């Protein structure tokens, strides 16, 4: 994770299908990475620790993350690099857990399958709740211009599959 992950919307969309990581049989595209990245950022910011970091000025979310040195790292990496590394690690862990679930024949329940089938409708309701016109607008706002419904659904599916094994242990 070196340099910056920031790009204009056209470049992001043009590189959406570029494979940026591989682990086993799993491949992660740039657009899927966006979902993992922004979910990581949002999770951190909503945590007590993230609130603490912002309150004491160690992270300023109003400024670009690729311009701020991460106070959690001693190697000079930026907050953007920190979250990118965390997102890749999370994806790798989700893949490993999903693989273990498959190896142990742990399948999604009917309710979990239905939840995945209803991701679009759930996002549509969220978009309406926040006064947005579409799922695409909601996703653009939450995870960036290059990521779409399929990328968000991939995140949810991998999470659910991995949780089958994680919760079984």
PLM ranges: what are they?
Residues 146, 150-159:
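Acidic, Ser/Thr/Gly/Pro-rich low-complexity segments that form flexible
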Residues 7-149:
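N-terminal targeting/tethering segments
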Residues 1-3:
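Bacterial signal peptide processing site
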């Amino acid at each position: 994770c070196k340099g910056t992950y920031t790009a204009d919307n056209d470049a992001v969309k043009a590189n959406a299908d570029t494979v940026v990581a591989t682990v086993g049989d799993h491949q992660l595209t740039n657009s899927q990475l966006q979902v993992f990245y922004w979910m990581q950022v949002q999770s951190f910011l909503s945590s007590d620790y993230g609130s603490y970091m912002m309150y004491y000025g160690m992270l300023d979310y109003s400024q670009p993350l690729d311009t701020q040195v991460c106070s959690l790292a001693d190697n000079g990496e930026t907050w953007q690099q920190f979250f990118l590394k965390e997102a890749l690690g999370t994806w790798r862990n989700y893949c490993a857990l999903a693989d273990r679930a498959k190896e142990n024949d742990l399948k999604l329940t009917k309710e979990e399958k239905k939840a995945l089938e209803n991701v679009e409708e759930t996002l549509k309701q969220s978009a309406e709740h926040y006064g947005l016109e579409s799922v695409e607008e909601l996703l653009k706002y939450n995870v960036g211009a290059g990521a779409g419904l399929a990328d968000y659904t991939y995140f949810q599916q991998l999470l659910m599959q991995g949780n089958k094994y994680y919760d079984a242990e």
